[in-house]
Amino acid sequence: VREMGGLHKFSGWSGPILTDSGGFQVFSLASLRKIKEEGVYFQSHVDGRHIFMGPEESMRIQSNLGSTIAMAFDECVENPAKYEYAKKSCERTVRWLERCKAEMQRLNSLPGTVNPHQLLFGINQGCTFDELRIENMKQISALDLDGYAIGGLAVGEPKEDMYRIISAVEPYAPADKIRYLMLSLIHISEPTR
């Protein structure tokens, strides 16, 4: 895709394109992954290969795709989760975000970058714990990114919790930046018979 000029040229689409970091995809491979400070080690469900993905790798992949918006690499925690694990995950996600920002700035400054104006969005996490969610949004907002997403929703929690979290966190998202609500429609749609 990089050799073809990035996603915009490859697809013939001149509008905005957002690429995900791989965090949700890693979440979906729960039985095949190991999360560490440096990133995530997982096993391919296709051929059994061992693969590593960290913040820098995620940013390099998204930079090569040349999307308009790149999402920061984060850990999406399945609900319900224990408070202590959710807290540690939030802290790690902020550290990963700092690494994403540094790598994105480096990549955007390189000659030959597909999209040197690529935007970076941070992702709010904290499971169903309002205080973790609010603190996490304050921490990621302090990094002065291009936009902010509320992520880690519709991953097992009741809809009432999802709506409560959105209401609790939204006031802490910077009003002068783009806001993005990330939802897995697979988990919130009602089954039809």
Regions found by a protein language model. Name each.
Residues 17-20, 70-72, 120-124, 148-150, ...:
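Hydrophobic faces of well-ordered beta-strands that scaffold small-molecule active sites
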Residues 3, 137, 162-167:
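Charged helix-capping and loop-helix junction motifs
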Residues 50, 81-92, 128-135, 157-161, ...:
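Alpha-helix N-cap and loop-to-helix initiation/capping positions
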Residues 23-25, 75-78, 126-128, 154, ...:
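Active-site-proximal loop/turn and secondary-structure-junction residues that shape catalytic pockets
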Residues 1-114:
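Non-catalytic, usually N-terminal nucleic-acid engagement modules in DNA/RNA processing proteins
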Residues 186-193:
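Residue-level detector of conserved catalytic or cofactor/ligand-binding positions
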Residues 155-158, 162, 168-171:
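Active-site-proximal segments of catalytic enzyme domains
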Residues 64-68, 92-120, 125-155, 172:
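Alpha/beta enzyme core
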